[in-house]
Curated annotation (Swiss-Prot):
Cofactor binding, note field: Binds 2 [4Fe-4S] clusters. Binds 1 [4Fe-4S] cluster coordinated with 3 cysteines and an exchangeable S-adenosyl-L-methionine and 1 [4Fe-4S] cluster coordinated with 3 cysteines and the GTP-derived substrate.
Coiled-coil parts of chain: none
CDD domains (UniProt xref): Radical_SAM (cd01335), Twitch_MoaA (cd21117)
The name this protein goes by in its record: GTP 3',8-cyclase 1
Protein residues bound to GTP: 30, 80, 115, 176, 278-280
TM helices/strands, residue ranges: none
Catalytic activity, as annotated: GTP + AH2 + S-adenosyl-L-methionine = (8S)-3',8-cyclo-7,8-dihydroguanosine 5'-triphosphate + 5'-deoxyadenosine + L-methionine + A + H(+)
Co-factor(s): [4Fe-4S] cluster
């Protein structure tokens, strides 16, 4: 019997909704397309040199399409392209075109978004729009060029700002700006970032500093908590109102007195494990149930060995039904909480790195 080709193995199967052991539905897939990045942010990739995934192991566009079809069959309705830095990947427009063609009621895919550091965005945004990208999130930790250089170890602040402005000019809506907030580094810029976001038709989301793989300099005293953020912003703006939460998105959203909105993702002090519907696929096809997961399920190997669409649906369904991960809650419960994984462990297995599994 001949090995099935990829077009043979993506035959549609009925959509099912799968629950894990904590009764959490699968809904959101974080799809890393590359592990490399052109920044060296101190909270994610502080080292200058890394061990990259073997290039021959990276999923092709057809393989990405086939695996995404599997996840759509078991209830995923949102796909977010991540990295590393996804804009580094040369065939990203083809990936976006392939995935955007799936958006619609028939497949169940309702949302296709991308998270980028913005360095290459100004030159790529029109191509992303033409390829069918729906939403863009840009990481921006500071409005001050010197601070940007200190945090990212690169001198690219002007390029990121230009990229964000290009997103607005291209007509994208529901744009987000993600800011990792660190005490002593940028915690005094929250209001300034909200004001900047207003000018580019975006909503800023403040993220507590997390102790995930790669955060080898993490310490509790550097965490500027959700409570700290709200207290700081109320001193500037007055009473801040929480907004109703209607889905499993990680951000708690708030409104200023004038109606301007922003979000806070408090994964460190208030984990959302109880409602987490997301999983992650690395660029080489390792499926991870949690950002803190130590191991995952390799989907690339069976795919390349000739597994059918339904074979992979069974693998993913079984894997999700066994899922009991509550990594952030377990970290919060630790009495002596320090760095999650030492540098030596990270160097031995690049799959443990934050930049490999996507934020």
């Amino acid at each position: 019997m001949s090995t099935p080709t990829l077009p043979d193995m993506v035959a549609p199967s009925p959509r099912v909704r799968v629950k894990d052991r904590c009764r959490r539905m699968m809904g959101d897939l974080r799809l890393s397309v590359i592990d490399q990045c052109n920044l060296r942010c101190r909270y994610c990739m502080p080292e200058e040199h890394y061990t990259w995934l073997p290039r021959q192991d990276l999923l092709s566009v057809k393989e990405i399409s086939a695996i995404v079809d599997v996840f759509l069959s078991v209830g995923v309705s949102k796909v977010r392209i991540t990295g590393g830095e996804p804009l580094i990947r040369p065939d990203l427009p083809e990936i976006v075109r392939t995935l955007s063609a799936k958006v619609g009621e028939d497949s169940g895919l309702r949302d296709l978004a991308i998270t980028t550091n913005g360095v290459l965005l100004a030159d790529r945004v029109d191509g992303l729009k033409a390829a069918g990208m729906k939403r863009i999130t840009v990481s921006l930790d500071t409005l001050q060029p010197e601070r940007f250089k200190a945090i990212s170890q690169r001198n690219s602040h002007d390029k990121v700002i230009a990229g964000i402005k290009a997103v607005a000019a291209a007509g994208f809506t529901d744009t987000k700006i993600d800011t990792t907030v660190m005490r002593g580094a940028n915690h005094d810029e929250l209001a300034d970032l909200i004001e900047f976001a207003r000018t580019v038709n975006a909503e800023v989301r403040f993220i507590e500093y997390m102790d995930v793989g790669g955060a080898t300099h993490w310490a509790w005293e550097k965490v500027f908590t959700k409570a700290n953020m709200l207290e700081s912003l109320e001193k500037r703006y007055g009473r801040i109102e929480p907004l109703p939460k209607h889905d499993t998105a990680p951000a708690n959203r708030y409104a200023l007195p004038d109606g301007t909105t922003f979000g806070i993702i408090a994964s460190t002090t208030e984990p959302f494990c109880a409602t987490c519907d997301r999983s992650r696929l690395t660029a080489d096809g390792l499926w991870l149930h949690c950002l803190y997961a130590i191991s995952g399920i390799n989907l690339r190997e069976p795919l390349r060995a000739g597994a059918t669409h339904d074979d992979l649906v069974e693998t993913v369904t079984t894997g999700w039904r066994r899922r009991a991960d509550r990594g952030a809650e377990q970290r919060l419960a630790q009495r002596e909480r320090g760095v999650f994984l030492p540098l030596s462990t990270l160097k031995a297995d690049p799959h443990l790195e934050m930049h490999t599994r996507g934020g």
